């Protein structure tokens, strides 16, 4: 039996190195995002998107492949019922996502596209998707008029950029601009 691919490390908030989660929260403030459903790829130990968006009344589904990040989520929601009601983080490999388990989203973050792909991820034996297939899945799960956001300073942007460029040509999306360090697309 194959084990699930997961990350053996964790990510604390280092805004000077990777400000994407903080900039996302700023973007939602600027866009007045309220009462929306958000999918967030890569929670970090800080859970700043889940916490702030939950407090604003948005619903957040977050995924982490880090045991430590998930354990901190459990501690967080155990101590904060309001956050627990509006923020659901799960531990898993995003490349194994089953679309039948997901609702539709108004906003999707793809800040870590191409960062966690293992050599066996898309193999028939493991059953995972490629980064492009995963991006297509979340595009399908994004409502018309919804947003997909990327982080061009990602450690894997050299690979993700090509995936995004091809995706932009083939999917019903349009680039609407940049916000601080984020690249923003809207689904038509």
Language model region names:
Residues 83-94:
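Conserved SAM-binding strand-loop segment of SAM-dependent methyltransferases
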Residues 123-144:
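A short glycine-rich, Lys/Arg-flanked "PGG" loop and its adjoining helix->strand segment in the class I
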Residues 106-128:
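A short SAM/SAH-binding and catalytic strip from SAM-dependent methyltransferases
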Residues 1-32:
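Class I SAM-dependent methyltransferase Rossmann-like catalytic core
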Residues 95-108:
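A short acidic, Gly/Pro-enriched loop at the edge of an enzyme's catalytic core
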Residues 45-58:
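Conserved SAM-binding loop of SAM-dependent methyltransferases across substrates and taxa
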Residues 59-65:
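Conserved SAM-binding motif I beta-strand of class I
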Residues 33-46:
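Conserved class I S-adenosyl-L-methionine
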């Amino acid at each position: 039996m194959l084990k699930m691919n997961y990350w053996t490390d964790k990510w604390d908030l280092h805004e000077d190195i990777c400000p994407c989660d903080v900039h996302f929260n700023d973007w939602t403030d600027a866009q007045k995002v309220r009462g929306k459903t958000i999918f967030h790829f890569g929670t970090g130990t800080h859970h700043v998107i889940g916490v702030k968006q939950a407090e604003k009344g948005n619903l957040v589904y977050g995924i982490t492949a880090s045991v430590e990040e998930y354990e901190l989520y459990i501690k967080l929601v155990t101590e904060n019922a309001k956050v627990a009601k509006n923020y659901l983080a799960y531990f898993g490999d995003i490349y194994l996502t089953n679309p039948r388990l997901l609702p539709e989203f108004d906003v999707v973050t793809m800040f870590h596209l191409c960062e966690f792909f293992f050599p066996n991820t898309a193999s028939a034996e493991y059953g995972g998707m490629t980064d492009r297939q995963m991006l297509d899945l979340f595009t399908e799960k994004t409502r018309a008029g919804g947003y997909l956001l990327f982080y061009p300073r990602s450690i894997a942007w050299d690979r993700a950029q090509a995936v995004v460029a091809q995706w932009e040509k083939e999917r019903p999306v349009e680039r609407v601009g940049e916000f601080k360090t984020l690249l923003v697309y809207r689904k038509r």
